[in-house]
Regions:
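C-terminal substrate/ligand-recognition segments
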Residues: 383, 392-465
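Beta-strand elements within well-structured catalytic alpha/beta cores of enzymes
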Residues: 9-24, 35, 59, 102, ...
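Basic/polar N-terminal segments that are highly enriched at the extreme N-terminus
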Residues: 1-9, 463-465
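Short glycine/proline-enriched loop/turn "hinge" motifs that connect secondary-structure elements
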Residues: 6-8, 187-191, 424-431
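Short, structured active-site-proximal loop/turn typified by the sulfatase FGly-forming signature C/S-X-P-X-R
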Residues: 24-67, 110-112
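His/Asp/Glu-rich, glycine-adjacent segments
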Residues: 63-211, 223, 285-290, 294-300, ...
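A short acidic (Asp/Glu
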Residues: 25-28, 123-125, 208-210, 253-257
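Secreted, luminal/periplasmic, and some membrane-associated catalytic domains
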Residues: 9, 18, 50-51, 75-91, ...
Length: 465
């Protein structure tokens, strides 16, 4: 087969990562539904864990975590002795990226990444990714990182500062997705990249707060669809092929599982105390878990402790299965970054990161939106503490201090995980809960598309066979 001539422009693509999109939600999204009906639509077989960083990396490399190395949204960095989530450097990803393959067929192929993960340091032409300003006095202010650097001021002047506190936290809402959509429209209009990747997270918020199958979820779907409509119109007018896909479907949950507390009670997890606050001590713990929604990597320091860890977790309600070396290999998770064991939650359960046994000894970051300090994922950051009668006064005071340029602590996150009603991370058990892939091109997709086939599909749609 001959390669396309480099002087023939590939078919331009817009790839929308519509987080949490499922068949049930699509019924409330007329613009996206029309795109699939005029073009094509299929179920998408996701990867384990079905979480953002892992799924996106599989889409872009065509490989499983066992090869690309992104085993979750975060993991235990053994060489550092630290748990780190939501890193941003593309150097953590192994393998041939979509744009690498595209440029072999078409030198000069241009790519814009608007808020897909592991954007920093990637060999893309245009980058926009959340990146707060961390001041020396401890303040954190909203902002973003861009390449080329001049794009930062261009977007900020046109759209305002990247709305970080609407991207995650108690205030997370449509505002962040709207900013990303508007930034994508601006980049398509002014830069015309061959490939534009855009991440729209709106369905991640109320579906985790209130569940995926009620009026709030359906309203969120309708809101996002209306916000996407002008971008879809722009792409159609330009002759740009649109692919909309999702990383996972969010399912209803009601049972938080305190996996680290179980390990601590068994004498396997260690903490150290400073100023009356307990901190996880991963370097001395015999075992601990890095919780990520419905999957947890369980790190066991010595092989002789594996049986004790298995026995402890076998007795913990809410765990469906523990993957050992063979189980990890079966599920594409056999990578050095994975835990010695991997715990999967039952369908209606999810894992907390909590390791303290007394809330009075919780670290102060537990009640903050602190995605980089917590040794595990904390969806409760989407809420303000309903048990604190002064929570809104505290929030208003903190915001006032922030506006005055003073240090502030927005300590409003509850320590009770029970409000969470939606989660993800397991492989779906039904098509209703499965992610989707839609394409504006007829007959481009059908039946079921594997996440590992998305890369080759996009190359085909671009005309880069």
């Amino acid at each position: 087969m001959t390669s396309p001539r480099s002087d023939t422009r590939p078919t331009p693509l817009l790839v929308l990562d519509v987080v949490g999109l499922t068949p049930r939600l699509l019924e409330h999204m007329p613009h996206l539904r029309a795109l699939g009906r005029a073009g094509s639509q299929a179920a998408l077989s996701t990867v384990l864990p079905a979480v953002t960083c892992t799924a996106q990396t599989t889409f872009l490399t065509g490989t499983l975590p066992s090869e690309h190395g992104i085993v979750a949204n975060g993991w235990y960095f053994r060489e550092l002795g630290d748990v780190l989530l939501w890193r941003q450097h593309n150097g953590l990803v192994s393998g041939d990226r979509l744009w690498d393959a595209a440029r072999r067929s078409h030198p000069g192929y241009t790519v814009a990444n608007i808020c897909w993960w592991y954007a920093m340091g990637a060999d893309t032409d245009i980058t926009v990714t959340p990146r707060p300003v961390y001041y020396a006095d401890g303040r954190k202010e909203p902002d973003c990182y861009t390449r080329p650097p001049a794009l930062h001021d261009e977007l900020t002047e046109k759209l305002g500062t990247f709305p970080l506190f609407h991207f995650w936290g108690p205030g997370a809402d449509l505002v962040s997705s709207q900013w990303i959509i508007d930034a994508t429209r601006h980049i398509l209009r002014t830069r015309r990249p061959d490939l534009a990747l855009a991440y729209v997270p709106h369905l991640d918020y109320d579906l985790q707060r209130y569940g995926p199958d009620g009026p709030r979820a359906f309203r969120a779907a309708a809101e996002l669809d209306a916000a996407l409509a002008p971008l879809l119109d722009d792409a159609r007018a330009e002759g740009r092929t649109v692919v909309a896909l999702s990383e996972y479907g969010i399912t209803r949950v009601s049972r938080p599982v305190d996996i680290n507390r179980a390990l601590r009670r068994a004498g396997l997890l260690e903490v150290h105390t400073q100023d009356g606050m307990e901190y996880l001590d991963p370097m001395t713990s015999r075992a601990f878990a890095v919780a990520d929604h419905q999957l947890a990597h369980v790190y066991v320091r010595r092989p002789e402790d594996l049986d004790a860890v298995r026995e402890t977790l076998a007795e913990l309600p809410g765990i469906e299965r523990l993957l050992d070396d063979e189980g990890k290999k079966e599920n594409g998770l056999d990578h050095p970054r994975s835990g010695e064991l991997v715990a999967l939650a039952e369908p209606d359960a999810w894992f907390t990161y909590y390791y303290w046994l007394d809330d009075a000894r919780a670290p102060d970051f537990a009640q903050l939106v602190e995605i980089h300090r917590k040794p595990g994922y904390d969806p409760v950051e989407l809420f303000m503490d309903p048990l604190d009668p002064y929570v809104r006064i505290k929030a208003a005071t903190a915001i006032a201090r922030k506006k005055l340029g003073m240090r502030y602590r927005l300590a409003v996150v509850p320590l009770d995980p029970s409000p969470i009603r939606g989660s993800h991370g397991r492989l779906p058990t039904s098509d209703d809960e499965s992610p989707l892939i839609l394409c504006s091109t007829p007959r481009a997709v059908s039946g079921r598309v594997a996440a590992t086939d998305v890369k080759s599909l996009l190359l085909h749609l671009a005309g880069l066979h």
